[in-house]
């Protein structure tokens, strides 16, 4: 099981192969992967953050490509899993945070790698306050909590099941 984890490892074909290798025959590999260009929170955080970050190194494969069914089929196929043994469900994870959206942005700034990197780059370019404003506007716009002192934001992801 890898929920929003293995998708961030480099070399996605090696990742799929290793997950299959360590799963016993008859077992399942289950992944939760963020979806590129999705209008919900995480894809939008990454989109905003990328505008403040330096370009990725040559050969970089975006972790978001794990949210594209054809890529997942290709990767697990190369690891020996036939297409008919791979299934997909779009699902929702709701971020519930007992503080305001700006405080939730601060938590992402402290603990979520892509956001941390974007703020590091934005600070070097004197644009950290712009990034902060954009992320706060995003979090505010997607917040579904009826309370002003809480944040509740649904985010869509692709649940992948590969039968080994």
Model feature map: region roles:
Residues 1-13, 35:
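A short SAM/SAH-binding and catalytic strip from SAM-dependent methyltransferases
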Residues 4, 56-59, 144:
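A short, structure-level motif marking secondary-structure boundaries and short turns
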Residues 7, 20-21, 152:
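A structural feature recognizing the 12-helix transmembrane core of secondary solute carriers
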Residues 9, 13, 39, 125, ...:
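Non-membrane alpha-helical structural segments and their capping/turn regions in soluble enzymes
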Residues 13-14, 20, 24-99, 115:
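Conserved catalytic/acceptor-binding region of the Class I
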Residues 18-19, 162:
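Class I S-adenosylmethionine-dependent transferase superfamily signal
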Residues 65-164:
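Conserved Class I S-adenosyl-L-methionine
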């Amino acid at each position: 099981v890898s929920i929003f984890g293995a998708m961030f490892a480099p070399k996605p074909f090696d990742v799929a192969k290793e997950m299959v290798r360590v799963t016993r025959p008859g077992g399942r590999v289950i992944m939760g992967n963020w979806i590129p260009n999705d209008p919900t929170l995480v894809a939008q955080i990454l989109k905003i953050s990328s505008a403040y970050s330096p370009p990725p190194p040559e050969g970089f494969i975006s972790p978001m490509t794990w949210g594209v069914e054809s890529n997942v089929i290709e990767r697990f196929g190369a690891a020996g899993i036939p297409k008919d043994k791979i299934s997909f469900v779009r699902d929702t994870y709701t971020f519930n945070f007992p503080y305001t959206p700006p405080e939730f942005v601060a938590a992402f700034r402290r603990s979520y790698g892509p956001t941390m990197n974007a703020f590091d780059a934005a600070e070097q370019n004197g644009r950290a306050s712009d990034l902060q404003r954009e992320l706060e506007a995003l979090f505010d716009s997607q917040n579904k909590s009826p309370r002003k002192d809480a944040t509740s934001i649904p985010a869509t992801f692709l649940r992948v099941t590969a039968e080994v």
